A protein has these predicted regions:
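Conserved, well-structured ligand/cofactor-binding cores
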Residues: 1-166
Length: 168
């Protein structure tokens, strides 16, 4: 396997050459292999999709507030839409059990979306400064849990139930 070198505040880290994630995601993969169950596991699809929805909404809100350029916002939205449409689900190698407030999952989404958005816009999109603008893992992750729960209830559980048997 070929690698590229990514840099962050902790220094250099080897990332698979074709991976859309960056240094912080790779560090989480390397340092926290807790369960072996990755974010690309089938039951996490709605969670990863909800991260894309949140990043899309944030990019549009930041544009409306004139905090980000139209070019960057559109590129982030395009990339985020691909994430919520499950086109890059294999780019989420983080273990489902992770430290803290889900920072690793949030950064994984930020890095994937930033790399896609950079490719689309030909302008450098920062995972922290652009994709994660006006957000915190403490807000993004609880929101993603709620959105993905709603998605799974409405798309999977409710259709599987025969609601005609319930008499209220």
């Amino acid at each position: 396997m070929k690698f590229r070198i990514e840099k962050d505040s902790l220094g250099n880290v080897k990332v698979p050459e074709k991976a859309l994630w960056g240094a912080q995601t790779q560090r989480a993969v390397d340092n926290f292999p807790i369960s072996g169950i990755k974010m690309d596991f089938p039951f996490t699809k709605s969670f990863v999709s909800s991260l894309g929805l949140i990043k899309d909404a944030a990019a549009k809100a930041n544009l409306k507030l004139k905090l980000i350029s139209s070019k960057k916002s559109k590129a982030i939205s395009k990339a985020a839409k691909e994430v919520w449409q499950e086109k890059h689900h294999n780019e989420f190698p983080i273990d489902v059990f992770q430290t803290g407030s889900g920072t690793s999952s949030n950064m994984n989404a930020n890095e994937v979306i930033a790399n896609l958005a950079t490719k689309y816009s030909k302008v450098k999109i920062s995972p922290n400064d652009d994709v994660n603008m006006s957000q915190s893992s403490n807000d993004v992750i609880p929101t993603a849990i709620k959105v993905s729960s709603h998605m799974d209830l409405t798309k999977k559980l409710y259709p599987a139930l025969d609601l005609s048997l319930i008499h209220i």
